[in-house]
Design a protein with these regions (language model features):
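Short N-terminal "domain-start" leader segments
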Residues: 1-39
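Intrinsically disordered, low-complexity regions of eukaryotic proteins
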Residues: 10, 19-20, 48, 66-67, ...
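Short, solvent-exposed aromatic-acidic interface loops
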Residues: 39-51
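Short beta-rich binding modules
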Residues: 43-45, 62-65, 83
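A short, exposed loop/beta-hairpin motif centered on an aromatic-Gly-Thr core
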Residues: 51-75, 90
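Short arginine-rich
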Residues: 81-96
Length: 100
């Protein structure tokens, strides 16, 4: 699920392996306000109301990273896209690519 906003970009990923009973979720957010920050959240997800949501309504982990002031918005978006691409290489699928 890619949601674009004027001040924030957000992409959600899931990795599902029913044979191993593994349902993982991962969310990456880029806040474009000063200071620019990239927040990642991860944890187990379950399917509710047609979408994947965090199990027990909470994420298992969260990491927030402030980007240096000398980076402009384009550099921040590049770092954000690199993180998203790493998730895709590890087998995570974008919410929007799933068929319900």
């Amino acid at each position: 699920m890619q949601q674009q906003n004027l001040f924030e970009e957000k992409t959600g990923f899931v990795s599902i392996d029913e044979t191993k009973n593994r349902y993982r979720g991962y969310v990456v957010r880029l806040k474009k306000t000063e200071p620019k920050t990239i927040t990642t959240q991860w944890g187990r997800v379950e399917k509710k109301e047609g979408t994947y949501q965090p199990k027990n309504e909470t994420w298992q982990g969260e990491k927030e990273e402030e980007l240096p002031d000398d980076l402009d918005e384009f550099d921040a978006v590049d770092i954000y896209n690199q993180i998203c691409e790493q998730r895709r290489k590890r087998g995570y699928v974008d919410y929007s690519e799933l068929r319900f």
